[in-house]
Amino acid sequence: MSSVRDYADLEGKVAVVTGGSRGIGAATARALAAHGTAVAVVGRDRAAIDATVGSITDLGGTAIGEVADCTREEELEALRRQGNERLGPVDILMPFAGGNGMPVATDTETGAHWRQVIESDLTSTFLTVSAFLPMMVARRSGVIVTMSSAAARQAARSSAAYAAAKAGVVAFSRHLAGEFAEHGIRVNCLAPSAVENDRMRAWMSEDERAALGAAFPLKRLGQPEDVAAAALFLASSASSWVTGVTVDLAGGKVML
């Protein structure tokens, strides 16, 4: 038997992916399902959720779709109950739900916008983890992969609120990793830079996207599947000695 671990251990596991109906979340849900993980795809748009679930089940994977607002504790509690009843206890939690980093100048950013972004990107991560963490502690096993952004560490084309929220996710994840390692729970974080998705295509032209991609050492934008590949590694036993880290996915831009 090879001493190099693969992703075979993902087969038979149960994962919850919030923000799972589109972009990075959808790509991650599909990647997990392709390796035999049963996935709960969570989002707010029923049609988008059903499309992602369908793309999984059409290929023989196991997935269910759930509508939930991850800033509402009662909806997350219902999600936990429903997921447990339909798929079983959660082994892998990926709280990817959040807003976007649309550019907002700090001198025009309002308190209302600040609170909304912190709620959608940081508080939602905390509440989602809080809903599922007791189950993992009781089983002394679990993997949590959170979603930050390159904006947490770099001056970026986003907003101060978004940068602060995503930096908060990094700190929260590191704290969780330290606090719950003794319970057999690993916590790591992903920090992607510019990933081409529907949102980006809606507010940037093809030429603008090409110019942005050319600014990266690897001369292209990230794709949702690039981030999903890293999420898959962190979810599997291939990363069994990895916890408390933030993985930068930035096409080499962290070197600049």
Name each region found by the language model.
Residues 134, 178-182, 240:
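Alpha-helical segment proximal to the catalytic Tyr-Lys
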Residues 149:
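Residue(s) in the substrate-gating loop at a strand-loop-helix junction
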Residues 129, 165, 173:
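Active-site helix of classical SDR
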Residues 14, 21-23:
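Conserved glycine-rich cofactor-binding loop
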Residues 107, 154-160, 182-183, 219, ...:
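Active-site loop immediately N-terminal to the catalytic Tyr-X3-Lys motif
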Residues 104-106, 110-118, 200, 212:
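Substrate-binding pocket helix/loop in short-chain dehydrogenase/reductase
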Residues 2-7, 103, 154, 232, ...:
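Short C-terminal tail/terminal secondary-structure segment
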Residues 110-126, 141, 145, 169, ...:
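Catalytic Tyr-X3-Lys loop
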